[in-house]
Amino acid sequence: MSKLANRADWADDEEFDDPSALPAQQVTTNKDGTKTVVSYRFNDEGKKVKVTRRIKTTVVREHVNPQVAERRSWAKFGLEKGHAPGPSFDTTSVGENIAFRPSINWKAQAAEAEKNGGEKGSMKDQLKDKKVKCRICSGEHFTARCPFKDTMAPVDEPTAGGAGEDDEAAAGAVGTGSGSYVPPHLRKGAAGGGERMGGKFEKDDLATLRVTNVSELAEEGELRDLFERFGRVTRVFLARDRETQRAKGFAFISFADRSDAARACEKMDGFGYRHLILRVEFAKRTT
């Protein structure tokens, strides 16, 4: 009887599966350094689901300034004495990490951001789109550097017809009484610019033609070939756009002989060139 009592029951070795129990998580290390994690869970329908995940561990090395690393290892003092290293959330608020990316065209980006923000830009930014325009030939250069400043008057400016009368009136208005003293700078002829050395007599034989309605595809060499049939051409100026480098629609042709210029003006006025009709006339002379 004692032998039967000490004998183990066969029912104790029987294992009963618990339907609510899940198998343990299995972690397997692969040869390529990754890990495969197998776990089980119940879905919304109460069914057992097997989940397999493959995890790859990446080590990121950060190079820190040695002085910065040394300061981080300092022991805290004062009210923070004895606390763990690093910022404490009850005394330190960590702001957003702003990534600084240097850019080559940072000036253009800053100007665009300023423009979008509605702020008034600098005077340089306001004038950067302005173009220089000559008052004589309407070209994109300063009037003082115009090659025709000595041979023609500004565009759309009337010639000096009553200039002498205006000078006489201005001079007479100062000293109306007989014998009254008139300062040198207010005397007749002093208000206008002085005569250039040999200016009027030197430029008498120079003839310049103004050619308008010129095609955008015109070239200075082509214009020179067209007008050199009537005489020697000393200078050809074709106004071009600074950005597109195309002709702006007008040009100036200077001849050595005025008779050749007159013949060219008569023959070339109304001449068809690149599907356009040229308008040729004598350029206005400066006074």
Swiss-Prot record:
Among SUPFAM superfamilies, the record links this protein to: RNA-binding domain, RBD
The terms under GO molecular function for this entry are: RNA binding; translation initiation factor activity
Q: Which UniProt keywords apply?
A: Cytoplasm, Initiation factor, Protein biosynthesis, RNA-binding
Q: Specify whether Translocase is a keyword of the entry.
A: no
The family database entries (InterPro entries) matched by this protein are listed as: eIF3_g, eIF3g_N, eIF3G_RRM, Nucleotide-bd_a/b_plait_sf, RBD_domain_sf, RRM_dom
Subcellular location(s): the record lists: Cytoplasm
Return the GO cellular component terms, semicolon-separated. Answer: eukaryotic 43S preinitiation complex; eukaryotic 48S preinitiation complex; eukaryotic translation initiation factor 3 complex, eIF3e; eukaryotic translation initiation factor 3 complex, eIF3m; multi-eIF complex
Pfam families documented for this protein: eIF3g (PF12353), RRM_1 (PF00076)
- Note the SMART domains from the entry: RRM (SM00360)
Where the record annotates domain RRM, the positions are: 207-285
**What does the record note on quaternary structure?**
Component of the eukaryotic translation initiation factor 3 (eIF-3) complex.
Its annotated function is as follows: RNA-binding component of the eukaryotic translation initiation factor 3 (eIF-3) complex, which is involved in protein synthesis of a specialized repertoire of mRNAs and, together with other initiation factors, stimulates binding of mRNA and methionyl-tRNAi to the 40S ribosome. The eIF-3 complex specifically targets and initiates translation of a subset of mRNAs involved in cell proliferation. This subunit can bind 18S rRNA.
Q: Which family does it belong to?
A: Belongs to the eIF-3 subunit G family.
Q: What is this protein called?
A: Eukaryotic translation initiation factor 3 subunit G
**Organism whose genome encodes this protein:** Aspergillus oryzae (strain ATCC 42149 / RIB 40)
Q: What is the lineage of its organism?
A: Eukaryota, Fungi, Dikarya, Ascomycota, Pezizomycotina
